[in-house]
Amino acid sequence: MKTWFTLIALLLVAPLVRAGFDEGTDYKRLANPQPTVNPDQIEVLELFWYGCPHCYHLEPQLSAWLENKPDDVAFVRMPAVLGADWELLARAYYTMELLGVEEQVHRPLLEHIHKQRKRIRSVDYVKAVFVEQGVQEQDFDRTFESFAVITKTSRARQARSLYGITGVPVLVVNGKYLTSAQMAGGNKDML
């Protein structure tokens, strides 16, 4: 009798359990695949914006995923530049990347915007966040205005058309497959 009830329960629940991801629903295949940094690894590219509340809420789940990601998976962050006002924070990201201070500045910058509700609209305010985290002012100034940061920000601006994005956060796998929280059914299901 117990086996019979178990079988009935499984039959009732089975349609609710998804077997996998469906193209066109959970993700889309990019019409023009993009090259990855290292073709020998699976690349997961996150397109984000510091001012995006959805990106902020994805961060804890993303951090947990990163702690347990397989060794053959490379994770790359790219700040999206979907408008002129997004450029300042994209340059902030590339500044922290080039200075090697991502781990100490990334989360505090998100928290200034989303927890403390600060509007970051000037280079001076961005610099203050970096300095608060132990970055020297002259290092920030030199890097923020560098050719490398300007070039990387320009490439990030092109991502809008290359990946066909209209919002963030977005994950692109191996330069071929794009998903978002909206497509996948939530932040957790993106990962």
Per-segment meaning from a language model:
Residues K2-E87:
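Extracytoplasmic thiol/disulfide redox context detector
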Residues G20, V131-L191:
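C-terminal cap of thioredoxin/glutaredoxin-like
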Residues L45, Q116, F130, D139:
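Short, flexible active-site loop motifs that bind/organize anionic cofactors or intermediates
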Residues Y50, Y56-V129:
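Structural alpha/beta surface segment adjacent to cysteine/selenocysteine redox centers
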